[in-house]
Design a protein with these regions (language model features):
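Membrane-proximal envelope biogenesis segments
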Residues: 1-219
Length: 220
């Protein structure tokens, strides 16, 4: 009888564990299970982040390399010069797993990566503008006479506009469930899980382009 009871207890424990894993992986917390791709049709979160970060960086380089300029500046509406991937993924996971037809995010397939891309660009818009800037230079000629020279340069300003997770929740008309998921994923107690999931792309991990940078223009 004891052996039977023990066996039943073990089976129940296994069932409970499996049920908990299924529940968690099917909720917004499933994003923490997406560190590894389960099959050839899926990719891990880090792989998706690397791909999309590369696309973002390519856009910055495209602007810098094709828009004619003499000097280049980069500005951000919040003085942040990197993608806050933790926030992007929290919005993504809450949106996908919390909607009426919620799907698990424990693995990322093509359709989900496309949605993640959409959210990433919505939260990290890139624009640019150019303007002339004239500088007056006072020098002396070979005879010691003062001379004034004006130099007009074209300044390229790359503009980064970031949206917060709260702004995205409003834009996407989050339901109560989605907002609850978002708040849970932003709880400080999960910082270690985010760091483990994102690795070098964790919150604040590296600038994509330094502010007030200059480069030789290659555009025409």
């Amino acid at each position: 009888v004891v052996a039977i009871a023990t066996g039943i207890s073990v089976v129940l424990s296994i069932i409970i564990v499996i049920s908990l894993v299924a529940f968690v992986s099917g909720s917004a917390y499933g994003i923490f299970f997406a560190a590894d791709a389960p099959n050839e049709n899926a990719i891990s979160v880090q792989e998706a982040v690397e791909i999309l970060t590369g696309e973002y960086h390519d856009r910055l380089e495209e602007i810098s390399n094709t828009i004619q300029h003499d000097r280049q500046d980069i500005v951000a509406n919040d003085d942040v010069y990197f993608i806050r991937w933790q926030d992007v993924l929290a919005v993504f996971s809450s949106y996908v797993s919390g909607n009426e037809l919620g799907s698990p995010v424990a693995s990322l397939e093509e359709e989900q990566v496309d949605k993640l891309r959409e959210i990433m660009w919505a939260m990290n818009a890139v624009g640019y503008s150019t303007h002339p800037e004239t500088t007056t230079i006072n020098t002396t000629d070979e005879d010691g006479n003062p001379t004034t020279t004006e130099i007009t340069e074209t300044i390229l300003v790359i503009e980064l506009t970031h949206k917060t997770s709260d702004e995205m929740a409003a834009d996407y008309h989050f339901t109560t469930r989605q907002n609850t998921y978002l708040q849970l994923l932003q709880d400080p107690q999960y910082e270690e899980l985010w760091a483990e999931l994102l690795g070098g792309f964790a919150q604040g991990g590296g600038e994509l382009m330094n502010p007030d940078s200059t480069r030789t223009p290659t555009g025409t």
